[in-house]
Amino acid sequence: SLIHADLTRDHLLGQLSPHGNWRLRAIIDFGDAISGDLFYELVVLHLEIFDADLHMLREFLTAYQPSPFHLQGFVRKAMNLTLLHAYDPFNTLFARHPALRQCTSLNELASRLWDVSRSQ
């Protein structure tokens, strides 16, 4: 799949509705676009734009309706893509969420970042 690969706040253009709801209107700057896993986009989307909020991620996944194939082993896949991502999210993430530095394993960090069942 062709993916944007740099879905940061400055590449998403939106507009507030009269009711105060933000709506995406455009995605810009496809200079980093690559062929890759669709969930590669989730790394920056979740860790930067959603600020690692598991409830927001769960709502996004519910609306997006990924295939069972993509959801199988989701936490592990998402953490692998986080570790491989060209944009290193960890410095910013640990600065905003210092408690994450207390994780004693990658499995624990993966669970705290990506296990949407924790948000219920």
Give short role names for the model-derived ranges:
Residues 74-81:
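Alpha-helical scaffolds flanking conserved acidic
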Residues 114-120:
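Regulatory N- and C-terminal appendages and interdomain linkers associated
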Residues 57-58, 110-112:
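Catalytic core of nucleotide-sugar-dependent glycosyltransferases
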Residues 19-21, 43-45, 62, 107-108:
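Glycine-rich, phosphate-binding/catalytic loops in enzymes
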Residues 39-70, 82-99:
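Active-site activation/catalytic loop segments of kinase-like enzymes and analogous catalytic loops
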